[in-house]
Amino acid sequence: MICRKQNVAVKLNKFKISEMGKSKRHRKVKFGKRNNDLDAFGKSGMKALPKNDRFITDRHSSRFEIFYRTQGFIPEEEWELFLKHLASDLPQSFRFVENSKEGTVALQMFKEKFLSKVTRCTVENEDVIVKIREINWYPNGLAFEINLPKKALRRQTELQSLHNFLVVETACGILSRQEAVSMIPPLFMDIKSHHSILDMCASPGSKTVQLIEMLHADGEALPTGFVIANDLNNKRCYLLVHQSLRRSSSPCCVITNCDASQFPDVFMPDKFGKLTKLKFDRILCDVPCSSDGTLRKNLNLWKEWHVNQAYALHRLQRKIVERGLHLLATGGAVELVDVGNQLPQLVRSKGFHHWKVLDAEGNVYASPDEVPDELKSKIHNGLFPPDESVAEKLHLERCLRIFPHHQNTGGFFIAVLRKVGEFSWSTGNEADVLVPSGQNLKSSSEQNRRYDGIKEDPFVFLNDDNNELIQYGQLLFQSQSCFAFFFHFVREYFGMDDRFSNFSLLMRQKEVSKKGIIYLVNENIKHFIKNNEHRIKIINAGLRTFSRCSVSDSVRVDFRLVQDGLRYVIPLMSKRLVNISKDELLKLIKSKESILLKDLSDELHSQLKQIGEGSAALVCGAENAKCTFQVASWLGRCSVAPHLDKENRAHFLFMLDDLQAAYDMYKGNGTGGVDAKLEAVV
């Protein structure tokens, strides 16, 4: 039975059972303590290797084969098929966003234009019939795979249109190019729109995006729940900003930079305004591992694979999972959840009650007592299986193993855990401390923490009224009314209704500037940032909604609408909205330059002239369209231009069924100087 309140999905060593286990200046800044266990390892747990795998042709490892054959994980009659799949390239897989009108249209177009087509091409001197098939275990028919690796797809001229479609729609957040097995863990977590979710080791972010999508499953309404996407590596955190914040277009996510095994206690206000320790409703824990399941795409592993890599990471895995369990709601002991009835078409193997412990030479040790003294630092007690009675009580068979030869995927290990009682062990810091909201809870250990990386600019919320922010706002907006200036004039300029005053908006400006982006976050993200910014390094949060720009004297408000956050702003607007036909929208998007107003229809020309210069939203609800298109635009004195980047322009052309123009736009043949000019202005 799936827990409806507290789940944590945990991926441990792939194939191997293990115990749960901008100021632009680089300098040391206060925040978390670095975990030296990971200094030499990347996300996968493997040391960084040069990208020369295209020269690796021998996909064979005697050490790997000895280990897995000794374990008996793979039935003898399946062994050759298992090795054959491991030695072949991994198919490219992707999924469409659920509960999105544009995603529904894109999915239908994909099925009509590409799914039924059969294409022949040559890959490594072999004639290949390219097939696209639906991944039958993924819900609602939203996931697909192509029987070509990513590099081969990119190089085939016969498949250029399909490749362009995938790249453009990925950049716009309509689909996610994601390994099939990576899609599985979030599907077992039963995400609801009010849940607080922690992704402890989030980079590169594909599963984080999945979690965010599930948070938005109820439709267009802004969820009250949120996702904290954390990663140890500072550089990978900025990849997360692009993957999780930009592509998901969600105001319900924040990126943090912290060692997952030392993720600090964080605090949120309760209904009485008192700060209490946050216990997350769901936690995804994709721990560093030996990457056995990635052999099909990480070819260097064939040379580098070693059982000691898994042993070296075991303690770290356990520390991360234990910390995650402490952060999970209603603290206590855990049990493995039986998810055998979920995703019935997903072929999986059950977890094992017993496994063998080998050293680097292939010697098997039945118990810790048999391990030589010189190996006990590497082969420790925690690596050995429990007694059979304990294994039965723990229901280890409820773990899931995904093997490559079952459904032509990578490999994965998954365990879904649920809290059911109190822990018999403690980290020594488990009290739910209650203090008045806003009071600093910084402990001596937190004060002494230091973190490598870039010093982040502060988060400044526009609807706060403390003295420090008032002084800052008076300088920034050159108005005695401070942040009230923004809300008053923007509300009046765009005709915002009363709900706009409740928006949680922030800036990341350390110094006064004529440029600046305003981000939208939901209320709980605001509380998280305000009450925990001194406890954990926060990289970024929120959805770009407004941007300050240089304007002429005739424009009363020097803020423009940003495409990313337009869907949350338009329902509040009653002014500066322009209805536009499909043909005129196509004309605007395909234009290399801004369009002169005199070249538009008389009706549209009249509407735009009446609105006047400045930012506006163009809305196209064509009769035969299955969704409404909303485009942030800039109206000049005599011209109009949509404020879209190349990918968004190509995306709208796809949606408006002008595929050739979309391909030309993406390749660069359809872009012009208007984007560069507008970017220079703002």
Language-model features: locations:
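Polybasic, low-complexity RNA-engagement segments
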Residues: 21-129, 141-143, 147, 353-393, ...
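Class I S-adenosyl-L-methionine
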Residues: 85-86, 92-195, 214
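Short glycine-dipeptide loop
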Residues: 194, 218, 224, 328-332
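Conserved class I S-adenosyl-L-methionine
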Residues: 194-203
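Conserved SAM/SAH-binding loop
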Residues: 204-205, 291
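S-adenosyl-L-methionine
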Residues: 230-279
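Mobile active-site "lid"/loop adjacent to the S-adenosyl-L-methionine
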Residues: 234-235, 275-334, 377-378, 382, ...
